[in-house]
């Protein structure tokens, strides 16, 4: 449940099912009710007493940490980080799990390689009290413990907060509430195996209502965790309370992987249509709901919705475990045999850890994280991704730069089209200094950039989408309304007519070469 480390050490409910095994997926005294906000210095405030059962646990943990059961002043404690929530942060999918959390009576699947143990945030002790399958009711004050040997997660926080000086509380929860992401994913996988067709049309119409239903539950959970920390003697500014959003495990471009082994060997066992809906509809809507909940509750928000773009199941550098069936645990197989499927693997948790480290050090209240140039090194950006992408409207034609039919395979066409609000017309220009600097990313995928094919800089050359790689043929300069290849400054992006392909032409100062 916890890991001790040197002070300066650097360092989803199951989301899928196997059709022949699974028809569905998984599910002491409360510490306190939420108390009023306070700005008083934590050192000047005493904690409220815990109920006897929790105090006994606290005293035993203090003895293991310090050699005696006393509750110490904050400035005399070890520093700590703690994560709460569900399978997305517990370590489900990593494959290595702490004793007692890998069945048969407890399937929390906490991994020693989960993100909270791998950040570069200076801390003496790291705690992972999250549990695969958790919903907000398993986290909130007065909630329900998932297993007989588990505490409600807010009670675990109450104990840790009295024994260590908590620097960051990380919450990742919501997927197992109204959204029911696991059962939906199960259905999509089963439908693919049994040739029933895509599941997207079944869920698309009601998806936003599901998101709307989970938002107040996440908000209330954040408020409860604030109350737990106040009752433990902390002022709100003494630590960071971070709500982390969920990345998507699937994308429709997996066949661009030169080593694509096939859907069953690779584990991306859903229809192509469903991978597109997951990336372009389901995950973005979920992210917007999580962002709203975090902002309404006053938590720091980390938007990871694009973090796994280019690293989804069946890609050539995946950060997610695909469909996986453990035929040995349990035996005979059951729903628990596939619970590791479609969850972040060890590389995914390392990416989480990198983003969390950058966020902690940044001081930002809201930030987004992604891998902008397929380097495997996530980069943090201020603000939410929802605000970063903008249309490129041509001053001459009045149309917008459009990814044709929202298809993002390598070589996909980029044209003009009547302006709308679709993600196929959103673009983000990377103004940073990293490997992806000066690239133009499609809102559909952070791993698809505007590209001059083969670096052929000539008048009339049509542009397309390609894997983002940070090469010169994906770098552009914005100058006086024009967009020019960084390596060919006399050529400008041009829309000759409303629906013409986006081409390079000699810069001539015309409105057809200006974008607003």
State the predicted function of each range:
Residues 1-39:
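Secretory targeting and sorting signals
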Residues 31-79:
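Low-complexity, acidic Ser/Thr/Pro-rich repeat tracts that form intrinsically disordered stalk/linker regions
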Residues 326-374:
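Histidine-centered active-site loop/cap adjacent to the catalytic His
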Residues 379-409, 426-457, 473-499, 516:
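Extracellular glycan-recognition/adhesion modules and their associated mucin-like linkers
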């Amino acid at each position: 449940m916890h890991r001790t480390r040197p002070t300066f050490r650097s360092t989803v409910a199951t989301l899928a099912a196997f059709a022949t095994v699974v028809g569905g997926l998984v599910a002491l005294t409360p510490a306190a009710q939420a108390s009023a906000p306070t700005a008083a210095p934590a050192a000047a405030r005493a904690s409220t007493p815990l109920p006897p059962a929790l105090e006994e646990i606290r005293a035993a943990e203090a003895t293991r940490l310090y050699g005696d059961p006393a509750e110490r002043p904050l400035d005399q404690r070890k520093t700590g980080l703690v994560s709460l929530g569900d399978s997305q942060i517990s370590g489900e999918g990593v494959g290595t799990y702490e004793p007692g959390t890998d069945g048969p009576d407890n399937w929390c699947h906490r991994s020693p390689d989960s993100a909270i143990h791998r950040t570069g945030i200076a801390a003496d002790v790291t705690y992972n009290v999250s549990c695969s399958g958790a919903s907000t009711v398993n986290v909130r004050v007065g909630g329900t413990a998932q297993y007989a040997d588990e505490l409600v997660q807010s009670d675990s926080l109450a104990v840790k907060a009295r024994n260590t000086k908590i620097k960051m509380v990380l919450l990742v929860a919501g997927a197992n509430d109204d959204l029911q992401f696991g059962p939906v994913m199960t259905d999509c996988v089963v439908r693919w195996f049994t040739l029933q067709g895509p599941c997207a049309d079944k869920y698309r119409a009601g998806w936003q209502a599901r998101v709307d239903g989970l938002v107040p539950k996440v908000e209330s959970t954040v408020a409860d965790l604030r109350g737990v920390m106040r009752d433990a003697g902390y002022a709100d500014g003494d630590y960071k309370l971070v709500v982390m959003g969920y990345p998507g495990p699937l994308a429709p471009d997996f066949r661009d992987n030169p080593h694509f082994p096939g859907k069953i060997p690779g584990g991306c066992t859903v229809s192509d249509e469903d991978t597109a809906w997951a990336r372009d509809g389901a995950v973005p809507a979920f992210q917007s709901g999580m962002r709203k909940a975090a902002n309404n509750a006053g938590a720091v928000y980390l938007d990871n919705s694009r973090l796994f773009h280019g690293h989804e199941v069946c890609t050539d550098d995946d950060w997610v475990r695909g469909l996986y069936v453990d035929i040995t645990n349990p035996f005979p197989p059951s729903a628990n045999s596939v619970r590791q499927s479609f969850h972040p693997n060890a590389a995914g948790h390392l990416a989480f850890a990198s983003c969390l480290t950058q966020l902690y050090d940044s001081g930002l209240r809201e930030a987004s994280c992604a891998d902008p140039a397929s380097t495997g090194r996530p980069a943090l950006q201020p603000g939410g991704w929802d605000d970063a992408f903008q249309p490129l409207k041509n001053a001459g034609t009045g149309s917008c730069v459009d990814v044709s039919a929202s298809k993002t395979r390598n070589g996909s066409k980029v044209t003009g089209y009547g302006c709308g609000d679709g993600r196929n017309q959103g673009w983000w220009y990377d103004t940073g200094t990293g490997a992806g600097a000066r690239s133009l990313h499609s809102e559909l995928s952070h791993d698809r950039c505007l590209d001059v094919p083969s670096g052929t800089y000539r008048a009339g050359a049509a542009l397309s989408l390609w894997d983002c790689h940070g090469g010169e043929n994906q770098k552009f300069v914005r100058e006086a309304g024009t967009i020019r290849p960084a390596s060919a400054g006399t050529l400008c992006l041009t829309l000759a007519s409303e629906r013409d392909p986006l081409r390079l032409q000699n810069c001539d100062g015309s409105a057809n070469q200006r974008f607003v």
